[in-house]
Amino acid sequence: MSRNSYIQQSSDIQAAGGLVPMVIEQSARGERAYDIYSRLLKERVIFLVGPVEDYMANLVVAQLLFLEAENPDKDIHLYINSPGGSVTAGMSIYDTMQFIKPDVSTICIGQACSMGAFLLAAGAAGKRHCLPNSRVMIHQPLGGFQGQATDIEIHAQEILNIKARLNELLAHHTGQSLETIKRDTERDNFMSAARAAEYGLIDSVYDKRQLAS
């Protein structure tokens, strides 16, 4: 499992030091080494770290589907630390989260901005969380298409369509009115963890891990 497992955001990891910690486990059949992300995947933990783009989204989707196949009745925990990124890549993760049978719990560590915030809010109801010093930011989708005037007009209309769809989904997941979402995403809107909970983007702020009694 150590090779066909979770190897994500290698550039971010290399920038942080170049080495991924390894975990050694012993069993009756001897020792086995896992990189730390692979070991956590065994515990149904997935990391969404860095910009949301197609390659990273494919890895997250694959892990969601794998964990569903392993146990369709046990929660999956998605840890998010992302500045946002591609809408289409993010929507592939979103649709898979809604499609699979297990509940997907979302936890923001660091930041969840733009598409990262959208995915944070898309977790299972009652299972969306932030750590206390993380931040969340929502805004409207960005566009920067260049080309012929007619093509620019086509892409501008598509951005408006995407904006409308994202606003509808965000209203659904937060419980806010559509008009409130439209107003609050007009510009970059940063929130503390506590404010994100008040707004409905998350359900609670975690100070300490909740241990089973």
Swiss-Prot record:
Cellular localisation: Cytoplasm
Keyword Cytoplasm in record: yes
EC category: hydrolase
PROSITE patterns in UniProt: CLP_PROTEASE_HIS (PS00382), CLP_PROTEASE_SER (PS00381)
EC number(s) reported in the record: 3.4.21.92
GO biological process: protein quality control for misfolded or incompletely synthesized proteins
Gene Ontology cellular component annotations, sorted alphabetically: cytoplasm; endopeptidase Clp complex
InterPro entries cross-referenced by the UniProt entry: ClpP (IPR001907), ClpP/crotonase-like_dom_sf (IPR029045), ClpP/TepA (IPR023562), ClpP_His_AS (IPR033135), ClpP_Ser_AS (IPR018215)
CDD domains recorded: S14_ClpP_2
GO terms, molecular function: ATP-dependent peptidase activity; ATPase binding; serine-type endopeptidase activity
Coiled coil location: none
Catalytic residue positions: S114, H139
Signal peptide stretch: none
Reaction(s) catalysed (UniProt annotation): Hydrolysis of proteins to small peptides in the presence of ATP and magnesium. alpha-casein is the usual test substrate. In the absence of ATP, only oligopeptides shorter than five residues are hydrolyzed (such as succinyl-Leu-Tyr-|-NHMec, and Leu-Tyr-Leu-|-Tyr-Trp, in which cleavage of the -Tyr-|-Leu- and -Tyr-|-Trp bonds also occurs)
Keywords recorded for this protein, A-Z: Cytoplasm, Hydrolase, Protease, Serine protease
HAMAP family: ClpP (MF_00444)
Function: Cleaves peptides in various proteins in a process that requires ATP hydrolysis. Has a chymotrypsin-like activity. Plays a major role in the degradation of misfolded proteins.
Subunit structure comment from the entry: Fourteen ClpP subunits assemble into 2 heptameric rings which stack back to back to give a disk-like structure with a central cavity, resembling the structure of eukaryotic proteasomes.
Family: Belongs to the peptidase S14 family.
Protein name as catalogued: ATP-dependent Clp protease proteolytic subunit
Organism from which the protein derives: Pseudomonas entomophila (strain L48)
GN (gene name): clpP
